[in-house]
Amino acid sequence: MSHPQTSENPAVIPAGMKQLNLLAGFMETNGPLWGRLHEDDGLPVMGFRVELRHCNPMQICHGGMLMTFADMLLGFTCGIAAGGRKFMPTINLTGDYVGPAPLGAWVEGHGRLIRQTRNLSFAEAMITADGAPCLRTSGIMKIPSQETREGNVLALFREEHR
């Protein structure tokens, strides 16, 4: 049975997703990333469509791209959980590759906050490719002592679709 949001129909972006305005630097090269705030917990759900430029020679999404996506997802999860106005540098990021994300697949993750202290934020996610697990990830982010100009991560999820 073919689902409309699979590698068989790469143009489909899931309903409710908005393109995140990450138009500078590293993420401009690796995006676009899509996102929305989860209706139950207000934390980010993010995704991207695997393109050829994301793939290894076997036309499977490169592990480096999956970890880049995980870093963004967990960083935004921690940032939003802390009020949405702080950019959170990564202290530690781990990942276990549990399945492939083939060319054309829709890769998606929903961050989950585990714990927050005064200085650190801990999060995890199971990232899927067309609904099947592909990367289990966890991370520790540093909570900065003050808000940063470029740290309003919550605003990224509230902007109009571009």
List the predicted regions and their residue ranges.
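Terminal targeting signals and extreme-terminal segments of soluble enzymes
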Residues: 1-162
